[in-house]
C-alpha cells in the first residue's frame, strides 16, 4: 500500500518535481515531492477552488492541510495587505510549502507544522480554505467542519472542495449542520466547491 499524503512523517523515497502554473493572472512555481498530495500537477479540485475563492485586501486566511502550499500562496498573492497561515501535519509538505513561499517571493504568509487547527488554536480568520483529505476518514473531515466556526470571525467563510462521488453532498450537509447553510459556488469535472459563512452575533 502506498504511503498516504496525510502521514506526519513520510518515509517514501524522494522524487522531487516542479509545477509551473498560471492562476488568476499570476505565475507560480511549486516544488513538490513524493509523499505529498498531487505531486505531478495541481489537482482539478484545487483548480476549481482557486478559481472560486474570493479574498479581499487586508484579510486573514488559513490554508488548512496546505500540502505544498498552492492554495495559501495564491491567496497571499491575491490579498494585498492580508496575511495567510498555511498548516499541515506532514513534515515534508510543510518544508515544501516554506520553500514555495520563498520561491514565489510571498512576504505575507507563514507555514506552521501541526494537526488541523492545533497550530492556530487561539486565532480566528476571515477565510478558511481547504481541499479536505477525504481518505483520512470521516472523523478528520468532520473536525475540519465542526471546529471551523471557532476559528472564523463573524462573517468569515469556510471554503471546501470535494468530488461528488466521494461525498460532496454529504459534506455540504455537515457544513449546513455547523453553519446553518452551505452553498455550491462552483462545480466541474465531478467536483463541487462549497462555502459556508459564519453568522454575526
Question: What would you call each of these model-derived segments?
Answer:
Residues 155-162:
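Conserved beta-strand signature within the Rossmann-like core of class I S-adenosyl-L-methionine
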Residues 31, 110-112, 183-185:
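General small-molecule cofactor/ligand-binding pocket signal
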Residues 45-130, 136:
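Conserved SAM/SAH cofactor-binding pocket of Class I
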Residues 1-24, 34-35, 39:
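N-terminal auxiliary segments of SAM/dcSAM-dependent transferases
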Residues 142-154:
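A short glycine-rich, Lys/Arg-flanked "PGG" loop and its adjoining helix->strand segment in the class I
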Residues 31-53:
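Class I S-adenosylmethionine
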Residues 134-136, 163-168:
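Short "lid" loop at the C-terminus of a central beta-strand within the Rossmann-like core
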Residues 3-15, 168-201:
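Class I S-adenosyl-L-methionine
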